[in-house]
Structure formats: C-alpha cells, structure tokens
C-alpha cells in the first residue's frame, strides 16, 4: 500500500482537492488513516449485501473509488445471478478499480463505469451504496439523486449512505472535529498535512447534519431510515424501501 504524503510539504498555491492520479495512487492508505471506522463500514456493507441482495437484481456502488465496497459485496453474495455496477467520475480511480476487481476471480459480473453518478440510470436495484460520495455533490443535486435511487430500488431494497457529518451544537461539533484531528495525528499525519488537506477540501466537500440527511431521505420516499454506525463526525445510515 502506497503511503499518502500528498500534503506533507508546504504547498504555495493550494487548490481544491481532486481525485486525481496522485490521490488514486495512495487512496487506500489515505482513507484508512483519515476516516475513523472505514474498515467497519466496508465489512458491514458486505453483511448488508448478504441480507438484502436478491437473485436477478443489480447492485450499484456510486462513487466506488478503488472498489473496496464492491469486493466486500461480491464476497458476501448468496447468489452469482447478480450484476454489480460501480461508478466513479475519476478515470485514475476507475482504472485502479478495474485492476483491483479483476485480481480476484468471481462468477459475479462487475461493470465499472467512468461517469457522473447523476447521469446513471438506477433500475432493478436491491442495493445502492453511496460511501462518502454524496458530500461531494452540489447540495441542490442531492435530493434528485436520492429520489432516483428510491425509484430504482426494488421493494425491500437498501441504500447505504456513509458521510462526514456536521453538528448544530457548536461545542459538540468542535469536540468531534478535534477528536477526528487527533485520530489523524495518531495515524501519522502532521499538523501541516491535517491543515492543508482541510483547506483543500473546504470548497468541495459540503457536509450536512444527520437530521438533514434523514429529512432528505424522507423527501426522496424512504420511511425506514436509521443511523447504524458513527465514529466522531463520520458515520453511515441505511434506508430501506
């Protein structure tokens, strides 16, 4: 696993964070050291797939990055009569995802598309995964995407939505942010790396509160919604049709 050192030296003109070649190369290390509970979420996605994915249906991973979620799903399927569709708008991510998926033999077909997830038709879906993806879309586009997902899910289909959260209580918000930064420092990131990455992300990662997510999911059509995992200001929700 290549180590993330992208923000280890001072960057004079710090642009917005993008999922470019340099990020794709170190992404597994970056996300493990940056997102508390990421491995637990990936493991649980497989458990949910085991329970919810049905024969003859499709599974979508929207914002699939290098394919960790897809592999977890595929390992846990009860049938190979399923198609998994992974979508990411980063060509470097897609190339590595295809290579990663192809390194493991399976009879379950997987299609990896380089596209904007807003352009993808969702149909005959038993499971849709949005793993730290929605927060990178413009807020104005989020309800439309979730509504499309709801309509594309079969009855008893599941959406897994993992996000970084904001909190309305200022003291709690500051505490959880500080704990997250402590987590990153404990994983070897310097103060400079934490600061520069935060600055690079502030215009492209627009986070919402848990309440906002729940309200939006209800507007999209879901009625069974629950936060099933949280670690500091990161977490994951499930919504069942």
UniProtKB/Swiss-Prot annotation:
S-adenosyl-L-methionine binds at residues 38, 63-65, 88-89, 116-117, 131, 198. GO terms for molecular function: carboxyl- or carbamoyltransferase activity; S-adenosyl-L-methionine binding. The keyword Transferase applies. This is Carboxy-S-adenosyl-L-methionine synthase. It catalyses: prephenate + S-adenosyl-L-methionine = carboxy-S-adenosyl-L-methionine + 3-phenylpyruvate + H2O. It comes from Actinobacillus pleuropneumoniae serotype 3 (strain JL03). Its EC number is 2.1.3.-. It comes from the Bacteria.
């Amino acid at each position: 696993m290549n180590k993330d050192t992208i923000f280890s030296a001072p960057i004079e003109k710090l642009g917005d964070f993008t999922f470019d070649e340099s990020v794709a190369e170190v992404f597994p290390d970056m996300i493990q050291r940056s997102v508390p509970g990421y491995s637990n979420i990936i493991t649980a996605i497989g458990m949910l797939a085991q329970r919810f994915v049905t024969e003859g249906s499709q599974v979508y991973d929207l914002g699939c990055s290098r394919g960790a979620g897809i592999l977890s799903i595929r390992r846990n399927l009860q049938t190979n009569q399923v198609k998994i569709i992974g979508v990411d708008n980063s060509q470097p991510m897609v190339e590595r995802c295809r290579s990663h998926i192809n390194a493991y033999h399976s009879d379950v077909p997987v299609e990896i598309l380089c596209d904007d997830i807003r352009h993808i038709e969702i149909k005959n879906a038993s499971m849709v995964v949005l793993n730290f993806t929605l927060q990178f879309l413009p807020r104005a586009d989020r309800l439309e995407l979730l509504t499309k997902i709801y309509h594309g899910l079969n009855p008893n289909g599941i959406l897994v939505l993992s996000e970084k959260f904001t909190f309305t209580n200022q003291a709690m918000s500051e505490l959880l942010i500080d704990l997250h930064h402590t987590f990153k420092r404990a994983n070897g990131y310097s103060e400079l790396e934490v600061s520069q990455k935060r600055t690079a992300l502030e215009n492209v990662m627009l986070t919402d509160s848990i309440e906002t997510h729940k309200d939006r999911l209800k507007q999209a059509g879901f009625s069974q919604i629950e936060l099933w995992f949280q670690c500091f200001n990161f977490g994951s929700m499930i919504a069942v049709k």
